[in-house]
Amino acid sequence: MAVKIRLARCGRKKRPFYRMVVADERYARDGRFIEKVGTYNPLVNPAEVVVAKDRVEHWLGQGAQATRTVKSILKKEGVAVS
């Protein structure tokens, strides 16, 4: 089971809001997930990000891979991502 930290789209048409989730890579983008570790709202200026840093670090320590977009968000929030 390859685990990824990625963004799941929520919100409505033309008004995206994202949940940062830990999920098996085989699951659909907006489908099942293991744990919600944060949120990302790109519509406000500056973008609003809420991250449970301890849980993200836990999952990264367990071998989860962050997607490219999530890596850039986490770097801006000060979470060490390899």
Curated annotation (Swiss-Prot):
SUPFAM superfamilies in UniProt: Ribosomal protein S16
Domain of life: Bacteria
UniProt KW keywords: Ribonucleoprotein, Ribosomal protein
Gene3D superfamilies: 3.30.1320.10
Pfam families recorded: Ribosomal_S16 (PF00886)
GO MF, one annotated term: structural constituent of ribosome
Family: Belongs to the bacterial ribosomal protein bS16 family.
PANTHER family named among the record's database cross-references: 30S RIBOSOMAL PROTEIN S16, SMALL RIBOSOMAL SUBUNIT PROTEIN BS16M
Protein name as catalogued: Small ribosomal subunit protein bS16
Source organism per UniProt: Desulfosudis oleivorans (strain DSM 6200 / JCM 39069 / Hxd3)
Lineage: Bacteria, Pseudomonadati, Thermodesulfobacteriota, Desulfobacteria, Desulfobacterales
